Amino acid sequence: MNSLVPHTVFKDYGAVFDNLDVAESTRIDYRYRLPLFVSYVNLYGFDTNTYLNYKRHLRATAWSVSTKNKHLIVARVFLKEMHRQGLIPTDVTHNVKLFKQSKQHKKRGLNDIDIKRLTMWLSDLSDTPENDRLKAIFSLLLLQGLRLVEVCRLDVEDFDRENERLFVWGKGRDDKEPVPLLPQSVTSLRQYLRSNEVKEGALFRSNSHSQMGRRLSTRGLREIISVIFKMLHINKTAHGTRHFYTSQLLKHMPGELLDVAQFTRHRSIEMLREYDNRNKQDFALDKVISAFAGVSF
């Protein structure tokens, strides 16, 4: 069977995602990654084993398992939606598994040295509207553990000054949830709003020439953080701030995963368990190193 899909479908393949019940950012990511699968189909044709063979094709690449799975998942979502819409007669993804991926984080969060460099740099900044903006952003990342996308989604109205909390639109959530703010976060946000005269709409707006005045994007925020990290010789990603936040809570509340989850807003305790295990491994490693401190050659 050489063709289960009319050739016209692939000319406008992005339209298949229009009726998916997903966030727009997810839809954009799907459309970004799908052309690789489309090129594969155009080259090798489409039959009941295409998805399985595509997985074998991805396995032969030098990409990480995480990247391979991202491409495989997009192809799976695409094919399942094609089947749901009646564009192909069968679900060719059935019984084809994803690549097995370790649940442990490959990248570490900011460590104590990184935090010292960053906080000293922030504390030495002069009092300007731009610097107040940076301090407000980092207070939400370091002290509240917000994800980048959550920071970018915030509106001025989400800051409940009276009760000192934020209403955060979390990852994979349909409604905003209240997040209690630490005193320093409240102070930083108040100062930022006052000095920048932000009254309504997006809490953080872009200062770049092409996006001036528009809501700060996740990509834009990641770039801001990356530039600062590079300047301070912090070899970590922007998401490392959330890793730091979660690890710090677990260090001070060891084993209290349910309590920690209330603040990190992880939907899965399993993910927190991975963080907790990493902390325990680091603690044990220090003991192992000290055990062999007298052995040298």
What is each stretch, according to the model?
Residues 139, 143, 242-267, 273, ...:
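C-terminal catalytic core of tyrosine-transesterase DNA break-rejoin enzymes
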Residues 182-234:
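Active-site/catalytic core of tyrosine-dependent DNA strand-transfer enzymes
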Residues 117-148:
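Basic, Lys/Arg- and aromatic-enriched nucleic-acid-binding interface segment
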Residues 153-159, 261-268, 276-278:
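A short, basic/aromatic helix-end/turn motif that makes direct DNA contacts
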